[in-house]
């Protein structure tokens, strides 16, 4: 599910655990990260590398990733 970053990081700080940020360079990698997070019942942060921005607007990437995160299981969080 798509959540606010504070909804993930505040519990992580209290629970003394890390939340991984994964830079994704394509949809297959993003899907793989989300599926692994779901299997492990762990929150993840999906990012992208700034060097990739000249290849397409960030809005286009967001239009693809946000629906994927919204469809993700309630058992995990994606920000």
Predicted regions and their residues:
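N-terminal amphipathic alpha-helix/helix-capping segment at the start of soluble metabolic enzymes
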Residues: 1-21
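Conserved active-site and cofactor/substrate-binding residues in soluble primary-metabolism enzymes
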Residues: 3-4, 24-28, 56, 60-63
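Anion (oxyanion) recognition and catalysis
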Residues: 13, 38, 70
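Glycine-rich, proline-tolerant flexible connector loops at the mouths of alpha/beta enzymes
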Residues: 21, 44-59
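Conserved, mostly hydrophobic/aromatic
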Residues: 23, 33
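Catalytic domains of carbohydrate-active enzymes, especially glycoside hydrolases
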Residues: 36-44
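Alpha-helix-loop-beta-strand connector modules within alpha/beta enzyme cores
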Residues: 55-75
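Conserved small/polar residues in nucleotide/adenosyl-binding loops
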Residues: 78-79
